[in-house]
Amino acid sequence: MDFHSLLAVSPIDGRYAAKTASLRQYFSEFALIRNRVRVEVEYFITLCEIPLPQLADFGEGTGMSRDELFTRLRQLYQSMTPEDAQKVKDIEKITNHDVKAVEYFIKENFKALGISRWQEFVHFGLTSQDINNTSQPLMLKEALENEYIPALKEVISILSADVEAWKDVPMLARTHGQPATPTRLGKEFQVFVSRLEEQLRQFGQLTWPAKFGGATGNMNAHKVAFPDIDW
């Protein structure tokens, strides 16, 4: 929906919208819907690859190979448009449940692809938070890797050049706010470079846990339905 920036609730989408526009692909409601579709699709594909007995023949009689169908399913999120996301929102008006709307959206596309006989394994055994608790870490991870870290590296590069340019520039240092011994401007900027490099190193060590556990966190439905699979 188009709106005047002065009507935005938050400065993020108002005053600073031009500066934060690249984050919309990660943190907008559209992005959340797209990643929910992504998690649901990849989960279904994984069930096919195990395979569950009922999915061993997935794709037979459709005129397409399994890999071709997997590609078509992945296009649901890889090529998703705001218009597609609006379809999910329209379904939500009926379901009154945002994740269930995603499930129904995917099932509608199963019908369009001629694979509706396998559609009941979409969201099999899961609860909504399994989808949310996987989608949201993906959003954070990709925003950090694709937006924040490149920007941080650019800042470090600029400051490092300043450190080199100013390495012999003397300046007065202070202790307790009082003039003290001299230092060099380049060295003082190197302090900030070192701090940012340490933060960059720590970002590189981050892990991104997700959670699949079913309704009560014990994979109960999975175990009852398929007891021979190590869930």
Question: Which positions does each model-derived feature cover?
Answer:
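A helix-coil-helix interface module used to build multimeric assemblies
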Residues: D2-H222, F226-W231
